[in-house]
């Protein structure tokens, strides 16, 4: 059986499909959907989750819009986590925790940016 080489176009399409799929893993409701339909019990699918870990490498991670998908991908390596995702309450809890994280992160980032702007303003006025 001869190995077939992917064309540049096929590689580009595979990259886009895998990028989109990995980012879908940031959605706890999608993870619940996959778990309820038995995907996480399917050995080839679990192996595919292992294969997708290459997205953690900086040369690939830079394309992600939803970096929390990498954390979910990491958690999906654990059978216990995959089993818990069947429970809608588990997905709801993860969703709530993500919202809390984003809210806290946003407030913290705004405060940090304000402090930085104030510091720069002080440096500009004292440097004159």
From Swiss-Prot:
Cellular component GO terms held in the UniProt record: core mediator complex; mediator complex
Keywords: Activator, Nucleus, Transcription, Transcription regulation
Gene3D superfamilies xref list: Mediator of RNA polymerase II, submodule Med31 (Soh1) (1.10.10.1340)
GO MF, one example: transcription coregulator activity
A biological-process GO annotation: regulation of transcription by RNA polymerase II
Superkingdom as given in the UniProt entry: Eukaryota
Name of one Pfam family that matches: Med31
Subcellular location per the Swiss-Prot or TrEMBL entry: Nucleus
Functional note: Component of the Mediator complex, a coactivator involved in the regulated transcription of nearly all RNA polymerase II-dependent genes. Mediator functions as a bridge to convey information from gene-specific regulatory proteins to the basal RNA polymerase II transcription machinery. Mediator is recruited to promoters by direct interactions with regulatory proteins and serves as a scaffold for the assembly of a functional preinitiation complex with RNA polymerase II and the general transcription factors.
Family: Belongs to the Mediator complex subunit 31 family.
PANTHER family: MEDIATOR OF RNA POLYMERASE II TRANSCRIPTION SUBUNIT 31
Subunit structure and binding partners: Component of the Mediator complex.
Protein name, as recorded: Mediator of RNA polymerase II transcription subunit 31-A
Gene: med31-a
């Amino acid at each position: 059986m001869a190995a077939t080489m992917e064309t540049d176009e096929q590689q580009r399409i595979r990259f886009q499909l895998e990028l989109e799929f990995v980012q879908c893993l940031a959605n706890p409701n999608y993870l619940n959907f996959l778990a309820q339909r038995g995907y996480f019990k399917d050995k080839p699918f679990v192996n595919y989750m292992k294969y997708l870990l290459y997205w953690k490498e900086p040369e690939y991670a830079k394309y992600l819009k939803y970096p929390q998908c990498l954390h979910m991908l990491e958690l999906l390596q654990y059978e216990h986590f995959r089993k818990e995702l069947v429970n809608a309450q588990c997905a709801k809890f993860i969703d709530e925790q993500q919202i809390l994280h984003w809210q806290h992160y946003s407030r913290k980032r705004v405060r940090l940016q304000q402090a930085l702007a104030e510091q720069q303003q002080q440096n500009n006025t004292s440097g004159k």
